[in-house]
Amino acid sequence: MNISSNPMAHAIAILFIVFSFLFIPATTLFESEQEGYISAVISNKGLDFAKDLLIEKAVSSMIPLQLSDIEKSVKIPVIGKVQLGLSDIIICSVDIASSSVETGESGIVLVASGATANLSMDWGYSYKTWVITISDKGTAIVQVQGMVVVLNVALINQEGTLKLLLLDCGCHVEDIYIKVDGGASWLYQGIIDAFQGKIVSAVEDAIVKKIREGIIKLDSLLQSLPKQMQVNGVVALNVTFMDDPVLSNSSVELEINGLFTGADGVSVSNYCYYYHKGSQTFLSSKGSAKMVEISLHENVFDSAASVYFKANYMHWIVDKIPDQSLMNTAGWRFIIPRLYEQYPDDDMNLSMAVTSPPIIRITDHDIGTTIYADLVIEVLSSGEVVPVACISLVISASCSAEIHGNNLAGSIRLVNFTSSLKWSNIGNLHMHLVQAVMSTILRTFFVPYLNLHLGKGFPLPLPHGFTLQNAEIILQDSRVTVCSDVRFTDRYDLNNQLPVSW
């Protein structure tokens, strides 16, 4: 494959960026400040995808690769001492026959084998006779075969960010073939004798040097990753890495904090989150294996609800609903007669406020939520807003999760609710009649309004340029797990930034 040029460091980043957003739970009871609530696992299929992408990008980043000039004096039979030189030595293309990636206690080991590299170069020579100096020049084509490149790295957690350590890096060339254009009959063997080993060493050293430079650059970029991902003007996601990555012989596993905080940096640390983290296996193994599984514990959603609640985003003034007659006291004349008697034909508002953060619980087949809210009936009388009664609601709803692009979205369905009179300035209310009106309001305003926003969802922590493909959602063990393949769209600038969404 002949691949155009791109910066080496960012190309090598592709593999480890994929690794950097894969998370798995541990096995003990912890608080949120110590453990992560977004976890994921990357499978062998995902590792192979990342490996192939890494190799493609690494090759494209280093081609064309110019090597240093080589000079040497050699003795040629009959002719004597000859000064030989090679210049403009360029690796033009690299083809990888096979590759593998292994993970385990020794780190991540990537092996590219059976590689072939094609080089072009200029040659020149000169030697002196007793009368004159004789010189010549031309071009040559070189092919190195049986090249093996081995890269061994480790990922560790350093104060909430990932640090990349290069454990070993090597390149070995098995064979070399040289084709010389032009020159005297003795030139070919002279170049072979003088430069075969030097060309091999130059290729091996240049590739290793490029990889080392890329690893150093990548480590610096990983260290610079922010620990917070802005979702919108209200909430941000804590993406601090928790614990060291776990590398088994079939997967790479990491975890992040995963709780939402206020966009201004205010956390919800006064809410204590506890859960038991059991060992995690691939949920998609029953069917076709997916590349990655991203798991979000129910506490992630609880933290988001807490932030929105604290930011006063769970208070609505309702003045328009499909049954607009309920926005006038005349529509209530048979439901609350005294309301109409005191405020005949006055327009109304309904002020609805959630009184505590919604409680979200995930079971094996459902996402359930309980919402406590107060609904205040307000009358617009003589230019004033007059609260006349308050009804307390306990709402039970069922949520479904779905994937829209790279966003985890959803919808909500009203299961049931109870209502009770909290206070009233218009006497006692017939709550069985009011209950029917509350049902209409909840089904025609509250639920559609929530679904409008839930349908947009929030972004999963994926690298820029990667999209989910054929995603499935599984509900299990208090978690929403997204099992998905990924696709690389290459729609970002590798030259300017590390390709991550935060």
Q: What do these predicted ranges mean?
A:
Residues M1-P7:
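N-terminal secretory signal peptides that target proteins for export/translocation
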Residues A9-F16, S20-S120, L165, H172-W502:
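Extended, low-charge, aliphatic-rich alpha-helical segments
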Residues I134-S135:
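Mobile, glycine-rich extracellular loop/lid and propeptide segments
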Residues N152-Q158, S400-H404:
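Short beta-strand micro-motifs enriched in acidic
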